[in-house]
């Protein structure tokens, strides 16, 4: 009998990003497993988003890491074999997780960088919350693969972050938010980018290849697909 795929643990932050990641896992796995409705075992744990938001707002990444580690321990106790976190911003806490987590993680920016190389992109525009875009989460992983990147102008960062935090994470998708992201991505295209990183797991809820001025790298779905592959490789 073939071994079962590895049990995937999801460390959730916002409900919208975690739900999209989980839904992608469950809907795309059957095609790889060759069996209707089949997917690896999945467990999810999430602390209150308010707890994460409080830490992020005061720039307390150690506090973010402690929340993530608590989720990691609970998922490990429940049988998960490796972890994913469908939230780009809190990947800034990864430097405080190293050597302390009970399980290995797939890093969302590493997954996106690998896909950019596979598709032949060379210069990526970054979108996401203001904390993520200002951080080294993506530049560090992109530089390791010889990729260039462009950050939006400050005003664009702040408006995109406002839309994410006030609208998208609350399940609201106003058309003016779509237009704002399209305009920001258009300016990244003018700056020479050949693709855009949807570096917030809620952005794919309003932006896709169908309405983006640039090809998109959907961090949420790419992470879910990488988790499926990892689960199958470890079986």
Question: Where are these predicted regions, by residue range?
Answer:
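Non-catalytic structural scaffold of enzyme domains
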Residues: 1-235
